[in-house]
Amino acid sequence: MATTNQLIRKGRKTIKEKSKVPALEACPQRRGVCTRVYTTTPKKPNSAMRKVCRVRLTSGYEVSSYIGGEGHNLQEHSVVLIRGGRVKDLPGVRYHTVRGALDCAGVKDRKQGRSKYGAKKPKV
């Protein structure tokens, strides 16, 4: 226990909260260029081929970003927008690509939950 005199001299040190998305640098989204587009397998109980891209951001960071939805049009040198949000079964993937923004097209034939995948309202 610190004495009153010690607290007057030094004071309590506040613990700084570590960011879960450091590459965004307190921004909601960041723009970047795909350097590699590939598939990877998830951790133990799950099985799939998850679509991931490596992105060089305008902030200078290079991060892995998950491409959600069925099918995508991304390739090397595509300009994408990324947001925070990890993928629990892919270690090291802490960002998502925003579908329907910049070079990343929205998901085709998406009827429900369209806003998350950049899909326009279908014509009746």
Curated annotation (Swiss-Prot):
Full protein name: Small ribosomal subunit protein uS12
Sites bearing 3-methylthioaspartic acid, chain numbering: D89
Family matches, as SUPFAM superfamilies: Nucleic acid-binding proteins (SSF50249)
Family per record: Belongs to the universal ribosomal protein uS12 family.
Record gene name: rpsL
Keywords: Methylation, Ribonucleoprotein, Ribosomal protein, RNA-binding, rRNA-binding, tRNA-binding
One BP annotation, GO: translation
Protein purpose: With S4 and S5 plays an important role in translational accuracy.
Pfam families xref list: Ribosom_S12_S23
